[in-house]
Swiss-Prot record:
PANTHER family: ARAC-FAMILY TRANSCRIPTIONAL REGULATOR, HTH-TYPE TRANSCRIPTIONAL ACTIVATOR RHAR. Residues 179-277 form the HTH araC/xylS-type domain. GO terms for molecular function: DNA-binding transcription factor activity; sequence-specific DNA binding. Activates expression of the rhaSR operon in response to L-rhamnose. Gene3D superfamilies: Homeodomain-like (1.10.10.60), Jelly Rolls (2.60.120.10). It holds the Pfam family HTH_18. Binds DNA as a dimer. This is HTH-type transcriptional activator RhaR. Residues 196-217, 244-267 bind DNA.
Amino acid sequence: MRAPLLLESRDYLLSEQMPVAVTNRYPQETFVEHTHQFCEIVIVWRGNGLHVLNDHPYRITCGDVFYIQAADHHSYESVHDLVLDNIIYCPERLHLNAQWHKLLPPLGPEQNQGYWRLTTQGMAQARPIIQQLAQESRKTDSWSIQLTEVLLLQLAIVLKRHRYRAEQAHLLPDGEQLDLIMSALQQSLGAYFDMADFCHKNQLVERSLKQLFRQQTGMSISHYLRQIRLCHAKCLLRGSEHRISDIAARCGFEDSNYFSAVFTREAGMTPRDYRQRFIRSPVLPAKNEP
């Protein structure tokens, strides 16, 4: 198996002293699996796509945030009008006496440590900081180098204050419409999602919410739910021994035949063939061995 492409710091950071850079992806195209000599913060502003991080697939859209370590490997697939910012930084070049280890997860080896969502308010606060950071990181004077680190710290604090786990949006004091619906969908991977009931409980207008969701993500609510269910199915196919019919049920598909048809259409292969890709073949002994 070929090693992933390595992205080098010198190709993205203006000098060996500059700690931070911003790469705008307007839009983000399909990008092969790669790793880095630096760390990244990825913030998604619009559109959607499939982000595969350390072999874990995520259907990403507006408000998703990833903290990516240098040794992580990831790729972008099936992108549709995907707009995001990559904030690149080298931890060894940061000199401010800040609690970076608390501000920039992942904090441990657990899966999904690097995946968060950002509130609408947090996105509004982060955007101008990133714009200024992009400007300063293109300069080489000592003051700009120091200012980029200050701006990175400011951004890290804003993200810390306004990030949340997708399944915990209901704990936010003032849940925005998009935050609430994203949380509800994440909790409906294996169960029926009643849109009318959700809107009634949260005092939302269904038609307006559907329009807002499509405007921000580039897809309908039902399509997004189907996509994140398929991502969950891929994880189970790769990392569990559950029967395909059980996986279908765990991912909200009552009919395993329908699940297989949808999966095949989206992935270009059957669930069984997809699973086979991640099963290691046994090493056969040489012919002269007993």
